[in-house]
Amino acid sequence: MAYIESNSGKWEYVIGLEIHAQISSKSKLFSGSGTTFAASPNSQVSYVDAAMPGMLPVLNEYCVHQAIKTGLGLKAKVNKYSVFDRKNYFYADLPQGYQISQFYYPIVQDGTMEIPTSTGELKTIRINRLHLEQDAGKSMHDQSPHYSFIDLNRAGIGLMEIVTEPDISSPDEAAEFVKKLRSLLRYVGSCDGDMEKGSMRCDANVSVRRKGEPLGTRCEIKNINSIRNIVRAIEFEAKRQVDLIENGESVIQETRLFNADSGETRTMRSKEEAADYRYFPDPDLLPVILSDELINELKASLPELPDQKIDKYITKFGLSKYDAEVIVADESAAKYFEEAANECDPKLLANWLINELFGQLNKASAEISECKITPNDFAKLIKLIEDNTISGKIAKTVFEIMFETGKAADKIVEEQGLVQVSDSNVLNTVIDEVIRENPDSVEGYKGGKDKLFGFFVGQVMKKTGGKANPGLVNQLLKEKLGS
């Protein structure tokens, strides 16, 4: 467990998260309007979205199905009876004067998700609920020095709000939870998890306490838009609360905003309670009643989920838990790996994927879907290493050319004459030359300077242009030098 260190001792973090995940649907939750990102302002707005008098909402069945599938992925209870409520508050980008949400009877509740901790152990985070609600519009304050404008394109888009219990004990655990949840949503297909575009947003409820003491007063930090900022916002807020308490002041329950430039939180408004929103069932929408048949059908349609894939990669492919988790975290990377793993050694493949391919993709700020190397061609590169056609060092050169050009490994090796030298007669000739040219080093090695062995290997590799089989060079050198 992580602690906040202060002059008076250690304090514990107590953190709960609320994740707003935009449902990957072509139409909104209660209207047929489109949901295309970055469309022209107010180009995807129906009379329902604009709250014109007499316009009634019609529930999008696809959004309901996506919420059910997400709930099943979270090992949660899917409620056969759920109700939409009106959450009443005024804001300029909320044309109805209320938000349609689910307060009393959510569609999903009582789920769990396991996350890795700093000790390497798994920790279970309880999911209190997942409910459906509509998004608000967007206020635009940078278009004019005199006016604010409203874009209702986002108004009415379906959201899943996923609420955890306060089981998270450090900023890093919060980040791990969000990363794992995002991965799950992408596998299920219910949300693309793109925090930069706002399709996944995070609110953090943060309080502090001494070990064994009751829960402290919490503050909610709104709309954190990146994994890194989740960590920064929680760290700052917890430290702020500790400083207040140690100076004899009280923490006020409130909603705060995080400023990514300053790394600080600031007051947004006093924290509302449920009574402030005057929730009541929406009279324009019937309760959602689900059948066992539908729930079972959606359960059967779920793909292999991240935890299942990790187990498979460890048992079937022999990967380490770390390697399996790194690959499975990205669904596209997992598909790439599985396609290539049928053609070569999976463990060597995983090593090259993580250390070489992912590294190059990060440098290029590219996704694996943009990679010019096909899974089949990547597998062929691994096979060339496996059968000693090329050395690992040469393979890195070949890989870099493949990454830039998309050319097949065997063609690059053939065109540039990079085939590894594994002929003992040829290598013995080179080794004899090296020994003849370096009598002092030979004498030093035989006199006990073992580190000189690396010098001889380097000389052989230099004379062969790095093409000599390093394993065979080591073996032959030991025979020649009598070690």
Curated annotation (Swiss-Prot):
InterPro entries: Asn/Gln-tRNA_amidoTrfase_suB/E (IPR017959), Asn/Gln-tRNA_Trfase_suB/E_cat (IPR006075), Asn/Gln_amidotransferase (IPR018027), Asn/Gln_tRNA_amidoTrase-B-like (IPR003789), GatB (IPR004413), GatB_C_1 (IPR042114), GatB_Yqey_C_2 (IPR023168), Gln-tRNA_amidoTrfase_suB_CS (IPR017958). Gene3D superfamilies: 1.10.10.410, GatB domain, N-terminal subdomain (1.10.150.380). It comes from the Bacteria. The keyword Chaperone does not apply. It catalyses: L-glutamyl-tRNA(Gln) + L-glutamine + ATP + H2O = L-glutaminyl-tRNA(Gln) + L-glutamate + ADP + phosphate + H(+); L-aspartyl-tRNA(Asn) + L-glutamine + ATP + H2O = L-asparaginyl-tRNA(Asn) + L-glutamate + ADP + phosphate + 2 H(+). GO terms for molecular function: asparaginyl-tRNA synthase (glutamine-hydrolyzing) activity; ATP binding; glutaminyl-tRNA synthase (glutamine-hydrolyzing) activity. GO terms for biological process: glutaminyl-tRNAGln biosynthesis via transamidation; translation. SUPFAM superfamilies: GatB/YqeY motif, Glutamine synthetase/guanido kinase. It is an enzyme of class 6 (ligase). Keywords: ATP-binding, Ligase, Nucleotide-binding, Protein biosynthesis. PROSITE patterns: GATB. Its EC number is 6.3.5.-. PANTHER family: GLUTAMYL-TRNA GLN AMIDOTRANSFERASE SUBUNIT B MITOCHONDRIAL AND PROKARYOTIC PET112-RELATED (PTHR11659), GLUTAMYL-TRNA(GLN) AMIDOTRANSFERASE SUBUNIT B, MITOCHONDRIAL (PTHR11659:SF0). Heterotrimer of A, B and C subunits. Allows the formation of correctly charged Asn-tRNA(Asn) or Gln-tRNA(Gln) through the transamidation of misacylated Asp-tRNA(Asn) or Glu-tRNA(Gln) in organisms which lack either or both of asparaginyl-tRNA or glutaminyl-tRNA synthetases. The reaction takes place in the presence of glutamine and ATP through an activated phospho-Asp-tRNA(Asn) or phospho-Glu-tRNA(Gln). Belongs to the GatB/GatE family. GatB subfamily. This is Aspartyl/glutamyl-tRNA(Asn/Gln) amidotransferase subunit B. It comes from Rickettsia bellii (strain RML369-C). The lineage of its organism: Bacteria, Pseudomonadati, Pseudomonadota, Alphaproteobacteria, Rickettsiales. The gene is gatB.
